Design a protein with these regions (language model features):
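Short alpha-helical segment of the dimerization/phosphotransfer core of two-component systems
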Residues: 39-44
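Detector for a conserved hydrophobic position within an alpha-helical segment of the HATPase_c
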Residues: 182-183
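Conserved micro-motifs of the catalytic ATP-binding
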Residues: 58-65, 101-104
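Short conserved segment of the HATPase_c
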Residues: 150-162
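Acidic ATP/Mg2+-coordinating residue in the GHKL
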Residues: 145
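Short alpha-helical Gxxx[C/S/T] motif in the catalytic ATP-binding
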Residues: 175, 179
């Protein structure tokens, strides 16, 4: 992934240069075509960036510490609430965290939390529920929504890299794959199901 992403950057830079030149054309048809090209070039650049980020995450290892889990989860819940409300979704947060000490990599957990919430916002009709639980066995994050659920195919492939749902082709299909990787790096797992 990283080598492929690196090899794509040079031709994309050349294309971007030509596109910028064409956008300054006096011909309106040429400018319109160049504007469309620019949008596709931007999407390819984001795709290349995602490939590079994915490579780094696949090699990452958790840097856990015994953080203040209770306050950490309050921060997670607050940011999830703001994001959901900003996107017009109702949210119910159930925080079952007690004063317990557990070793977590907070950046890994934050990214998993953010990816799951983002996914739920995309597919929920109107409501999302998040539950945070912690025990000596581990940290549990459950996200559910009132959307139509995963198709049979999506249940099997949702954690594969670059898999996207039918109506969301503008996304790269990396969110749940990243969640899976980070959970596994942390000694956990990602479970996806329809309720």
């Amino acid at each position: 992934n990283a080598a492929f992403a690196h090899d794509l950057r040079t031709p994309l830079t050349v294309l971007k240069g030509y596109d910028e030149m064409l956008q300054s054309s006096s011909d309106s048809i040429t400018r319109d075509i160049a504007e469309t090209m620019g949008k596709h070039i931007f999407r390819l650049e984001r795709y290349v960036d995602s490939m590079s980020q994915l490579h780094r995450l696949e090699d990452a290892r958790p840097q856990g510490d015994n953080s203040d889990i209770k306050n950490f989860v309050i921060t997670l819940a607050d940011s999830a609430t703001i994001f959901c409300e900003k996107n017009g979704k109702k949210i119910c947060v159930q925080n079952n965290i007690t004063d317990i000490s557990i070793c977590l990599d907070c950046s890994f957990v934050s990214q998993v939390n953010n990816n799951l919430i983002s996914n739920a916002v995309r597919y929920a009709k109107s409501a999302i529920k998040i539950t945070y639980t912690c025990s000596k066995e581990g940290f549990y994050l459950t996200v559910s929504d009132d959307g139509c659920g995963f198709s049979k195919e999506a249940l099997c492939k949702a954690t594969n890299p670059y898999f996207t749902g039918e109506n969301h082709r503008e996304h790269f299909g990396l969110g749940l794959y990243i969640c899976k990787i980070l959970c596994e790096h942390h000694g956990g797992y990602l479970k996806i199901e329809n309720c």
